[in-house]
């Protein structure tokens, strides 16, 4: 009888543990990442705040990132693929939160980052652009239409790939 009760308790503990682990990893689910980290970004339809590299008249992908950010570095291959596929139809601007120009230049050269880079070379939370665009997570991406309005925001490059495919369907 004791073995049966012990076995039942052990099974219950295993089920509860597995259930708890499942809910803890839900935040890791790509569908939920934007809910967690992109919720306070500029709203769709908002005029994109001006900065020297941003020009109206073309679609623009803004990629807020830093060389010291592991998630950003992991997304670079996806951003490179986007740039290669859509770089003639949209302008890509990397908005770097790096403080050292030489480190940024070395990283972009070593990793084949060919799109324009913009940086204030200040600490992330001290930059005007991060305040203007309400950046609280890196990486963060914005899609700006030719009229200068925000049309999409995400913290996942793979989601931006899907959005660009909707806007620029293959012929």
Describe these PLM feature segments.
Residues 1-27:
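Bacterial Sec-dependent N-terminal signal peptides
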Residues 76-80, 101-105, 130, 161-164:
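Extracytoplasmic/secreted envelope proteins and their assembly/folding machinery
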Residues 23-56:
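N-terminal "domain-start" segment that seeds a small globular fold
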Residues 58-60, 64-68, 137:
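Short pre-active-site segment immediately N-terminal to redox-active cysteine/selenocysteine motifs
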Residues 113, 121-167:
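Thiol/disulfide oxidoreductase modules built on the thioredoxin-like
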Residues 82-125, 135-138:
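Conserved segment of the thioredoxin-like fold in thiol-based oxidoreductases
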Residues 64-81:
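Conserved redox-active cysteine motifs that mediate thiol-disulfide chemistry
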Residues 62, 93-95, 142:
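Conserved hydrophobic packing residues within short motifs/helices of P-loop NTPase cores
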């Amino acid at each position: 009888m004791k073995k049966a009760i012990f076995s039942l308790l052990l099974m219950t503990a295993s089920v509860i543990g597995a259930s708890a682990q499942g809910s803890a990893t839900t935040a890791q689910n790509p569908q939920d990442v934007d809910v967690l980290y992109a919720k306070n970004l500029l709203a769709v339809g908002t005029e994109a705040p001006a900065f020297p590299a941003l020009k109206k008249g073309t679609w623009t992908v803004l990629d807020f990132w830093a060389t010291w950010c592991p998630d950003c570095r992991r997304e670079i291959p996806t951003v490179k693929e986007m740039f290669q596929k859509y770089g003639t139809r949209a302008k890509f601007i990397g908005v770097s939160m790096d403080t050292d120009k030489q480190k940024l230049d070395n990283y972009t050269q070593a990793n084949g980052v060919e799109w324009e880079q913009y940086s204030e070379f200040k600490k992330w939370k001290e930059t005007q652009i991060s305040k203007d665009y309400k950046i609280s997570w890196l990486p963060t991406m914005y899609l700006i239409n030719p009229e200068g309005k925000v049309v999409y925001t995400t913290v996942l490059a793979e989601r931006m790939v899907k959005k660009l495919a909707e806007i620029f369907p293959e012929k």
